[in-house]
A protein has these predicted regions:
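Hinge/beta->alpha junction and helix N-cap segments in small-molecule ligand-binding domains
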Residues: 3-14, 30-76, 91-99, 121-124, ...
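Short acidic capping loops at alpha-helix termini that bridge into adjacent secondary structure
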Residues: 25-27, 57-62, 112-117
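Flexible loop/turn connectors
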Residues: 18, 78, 83-184
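Alpha-helical recognition/docking segments in bacterial nutrient-uptake
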Residues: 1-21, 82, 86
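Short acidic/polar active-site loop segments enriched in Thr and Asp
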Residues: 24-27, 86-88
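Solvent-exposed, well-ordered amphipathic alpha-helical segments
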Residues: 13-16, 24-25, 49, 104, ...
Length: 184
């Protein structure tokens, strides 16, 4: 059976590269369930992009929530902050996890992006309503649907559906949640 999805590696790569281009060198990661394919894929993409950018991967700057939701994201991010390892930006594996990061930063008197830049993933309908509006990776949902329908129609016409995965390139929507880090 064929599947169509956004390219996780490209999407996370866009977020990390954007932060690196702003001057961030210590970037944290908050992921969802690392056992899920999405969680594992996005984390592996994060590690690979850090290496590609020549940036350090510090295990103290990685936290995984048990679900891709705001509350578990907040708990994972709070634990990460409590470790005391300095960082200037965080890549959240989806927008709901990013919202959890916002909650914790606000509770601790830290500001986005003045103290910590934040990126999300998915460009959910409310991402532009975050305060400040969230920089996030946009999955080409419409194009995913069109390509999936094309593959389905081809399979119905041919009577076959060869196993394949089609990955479509996402884009980065830059909003107000990212900025250069403050000078040390």
């Amino acid at each position: 059976m064929a599947s169509v999805t956004g390219d996780e590696a490209v999407g996370i790569g866009l977020a990390v590269s954007h932060l690196a281009s702003l001057g961030h060198r210590h970037i944290a990661y908050v992921g969802g369930d690392a056992e899920a394919s999405t969680g594992l894929g996005r984390y592996q993409a994060f590690v690979a992009r850090l290496q590609h950018q020549g940036l350090p991967l510090d295990p103290d700057l990685v936290a995984h929530a048990d679900r891709f939701h705001e509350e578990p994201g907040a708990a994972a991010f709070a634990e990460l902050l409590d470790r005391g390892t300095p960082f200037t930006a965080v890549v959240a594996a989806n927008d709901r996890l990013a919202l959890g990061c916002y909650d914790v930063l606000h509770e601790r008197g830290l500001r986005v992006p003045e103290d910590v830049s934040v990126t999300g993933y998915n460009d959910m309908l409310f991402a532009d309503r975050f305060d400040p509006a969230l920089t996030t990776v946009r999955i080409p949902h419409y194009q995913v649907g069109v390509r999936a329908a094309q593959l389905l129609l081809e399979a119905l016409a041919d009577g076959e559906s060869p196993p394949m995965t089609v990955r479509l390139a996402p884009s980065l929507v830059v909003r107000a949640s990212t900025a250069p880090p403050r000078p040390a």
